[in-house]
Design a protein with these regions (language model features):
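Charged, low-complexity intrinsically disordered terminal segments
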Residues: 1-172
Length: 172
């Protein structure tokens, strides 16, 4: 993912349920900062609960300072008042990366080191992430755009109207 972010020319969109300020999480944040500084539009969204440690960290602020557009999915607000305004357990569990509308990653892997365990009694488990290239990236672009525009006053629908990049050789 870092290599693809470093090669991005137009935009990078990321959405993670859990994004931690650990080794892998910081590598992604650093790559996003580099991309934003060189003029790539970077939009990232992280779940308010699953990514709360990163969101409250200096890494999040450093991304903003570098020009990365950030959004928090499903803000919690004041936890004691949350039952009055909605369910705390409804979270955005997506893990999506879209780069230049031609590369996408998706799967069950959060943005965290492999050793990360939320609940040790359930671990170890195996997460997977798959890299796709070509027109299929547009599907994840739609998912990201829907979540982004639901939380941010930033209409990115124009990206969805662009011609699709040509498909390359694929595996059948």
């Amino acid at each position: 993912i870092v290599r693809d972010i470093d090669a991005a020319r137009d935009h990078v969109h990321l959405l993670f349920y859990i994004w931690l300020p650990d080794g892998n999480g910081c590598k992604i944040a650093e790559a996003l900062k580099r991309a934003a500084v060189r003029g790539v539009t970077c939009r990232v969204m992280a779940d308010a609960l699953g990514s709360r440690v990163l969101i409250a960290s200096a890494h999040w602020k450093a991304m903003v300072d570098a020009g990365v557009h950030v959004a928090v999915a499903l803000p919690i607000g004041i936890p004691l008042l949350r039952p009055l305004s909605g369910r705390l357990d409804l979270r955005n569990h997506r893990k999506i990366v879209v780069i230049d509308d031609r590369i996408t990653y998706c799967g069950s892997q959060n943005c965290a080191d492999p050793e990360f365990r939320v609940k040790p009694r359930y671990a170890p488990w195996v997460d997977a992430v798959v890299r796709f290239e070509g027109p299929i990236a547009r599907q994840n672009q739609h998912l990201f755009a829907a979540d982004w525009m639901a939380h941010v006053d930033d209409d990115i629908a124009e990206i969805l109207r662009r011609p699709l990049p040509p498909a390359g050789p694929g595996l059948i």
